[in-house]
Amino acid sequence: MQLNVNDAQAIEVSELTFGGEFNETLVHQAVVAYMAGGRQGTKQQKTRSDVAGGGKRPWRQKGTGRARAGTTRGPIWRGGGVTFAARPQDHSQKLNKKMYRAALRSILAELVRSDRLVVVQDFAVEAPKTKDLLNKLNGMGLNDVLIVSDAVDQNLYLAARNLPHVDVRDVQGSDPVSLIAYEKVLITVSAVKKFEELLG
């Protein structure tokens, strides 16, 4: 199949990488697994056994008329522990490489179908100036965009760093969440070829 290049002739690309069907279930699984892998999972609360104190019983077992109590650190006491306290846990989910790559292929194909993939021969800025990059993107009618190149250009990265709706990634750093989060994906021809190598 062919992909139209913004500032040059169309290029021939792999049907497998850029022309497959959209598998919503698989993409959802990949996104959930990716997001879950980014969770810290370090939240921790104290149970009745973790809270300091409470060793001596507050009053004797019998004779006071009050309900029996053996500690002041039970969950029903002020200053006591939490009933079902949160513990550190690993939220990561297993996703096979084959499935992850298939999800990326599915996303790329859907970007092409929905006209959200803008292919250019090359994309760079001469100096790390945010204003220059903004003018360049506005000239192309892009304001909410992910820029994907073969290797991240330092000037481009610095110029885009302060723009809230612009992100710069290389092919290796592109993930399912970043690829679907932006209105448009601006990708260089060399990055297209790299995607074909990795996912073909």
Swiss-Prot record:
InterPro entries linked to this entry: Ribosomal_uL4, Ribosomal_uL4-like, Ribosomal_uL4_dom_sf
GO molecular function, one term: structural constituent of ribosome
One Gene Ontology term from the biological process aspect of the record: translation
Keyword terms: Ribonucleoprotein, Ribosomal protein, RNA-binding, rRNA-binding
UniProt region (Disordered), positions on chain: 38-72
Gene Ontology cellular-component annotations: ribonucleoprotein complex; ribosome
Coiled-coil region(s): none
Protein family per UniProt: Belongs to the universal ribosomal protein uL4 family.
Annotated function: One of the primary rRNA binding proteins, this protein initially binds near the 5'-end of the 23S rRNA. It is important during the early stages of 50S assembly. It makes multiple contacts with different domains of the 23S rRNA in the assembled 50S subunit and ribosome.
Record note on quaternary structure: Part of the 50S ribosomal subunit.
Protein name per its UniProtKB record: Large ribosomal subunit protein uL4
Gene encoding the protein: rplD
